[in-house]
């Protein structure tokens, strides 16, 4: 599979707005949700459809097309991933929601799990992991491993900004997984933050410091 950087003008414009130092919590939250919706649109391009006959407004039979049996679970990585959830569900409203809670050790940059709750029948579902920032790739790799351990066979990743280091880690370990990202930035700093990045996405979404 591969990395898909979404080069749509609206996506690039919105990511640019999110980089402003003085952006408000409200605006950052809104833009996160809007870009998540657009990423979900891109990630669902290959969903299969099938014909169905319905009764139209005037009582006549109308042939329409509808999604064909694609079961989806959206998997936000707490806490920042919650900021993308509504945007993805706006596009895929029937998706079930699984949750993974991970905390990063700021000294080692390793991810530690403190919560996980998955929906049933993961082996029949496509999992869309959502997290605004793909930095070192530690949290994403841990989430992928948890999904696989619970039987999930189809996984895709949606994130706003990714660092080359994180992308390299995930694509090397999981070449079968597609990654959809709004922007690929330059590098990580010594603290494991993406540059130029967005700052701490969780703090900006929740208004904490």
From Swiss-Prot:
Q: Quick one: which residues bind uracil? A: 194, 199-201
Q: Which pathway features in its UniProt record?
A: Pyrimidine metabolism; UMP biosynthesis via salvage pathway; UMP from uracil: step 1/1
Q: What Gene3D superfamilies does the annotation carry?
A: 3.40.50.2020
Key words of the record = Allosteric enzyme, Glycosyltransferase, GTP-binding, Magnesium, Nucleotide-binding, Transferase
Instruction: Look at the named UniProt entry and state the broad enzyme category this protein falls under.
Output: transferase
The record's annotation in InterPro entries points to: PRibTrfase_dom, PRTase-like, Upp_B, UPRTase/APRTase, Ura_phspho_trans
Keyword GTP-binding, does the record have it? yes
How activity is controlled: the entry says: Allosterically activated by GTP.
- Per the UniProt record, which EC number(s) apply here? 2.4.2.9
Question: In which residues is 5-phospho-alpha-D-ribose 1-diphosphate bound?
Answer: 79, 104, 131-139, 200
Task: Classify the source by domain of life.
Answer: Bacteria
Task: Name the catalysed reactions.
Answer: UMP + diphosphate = 5-phospho-alpha-D-ribose 1-diphosphate + uracil
Q: Which GO terms describe its molecular function?
A: GTP binding; magnesium ion binding; uracil phosphoribosyltransferase activity
Q: Which GO terms describe its biological process?
A: UMP salvage; uracil salvage
Keyword presence, DNA damage: no
Cofactor note, please? Binds 1 Mg(2+) ion per subunit. The magnesium is bound as Mg-PRPP.
Which cofactor names does the annotation list? Mg(2+)
Q: Quote the PANTHER family the UniProt record gives.
A: ADENINE PHOSPHORIBOSYLTRANSFERASE (PTHR32315), URACIL PHOSPHORIBOSYLTRANSFERASE, CHLOROPLASTIC (PTHR32315:SF4)
In which family does this protein belong, per the annotation? Belongs to the UPRTase family.
Q: What does this protein do?
A: Catalyzes the conversion of uracil and 5-phospho-alpha-D-ribose 1-diphosphate (PRPP) to UMP and diphosphate.
What is this protein's record name? Uracil phosphoribosyltransferase
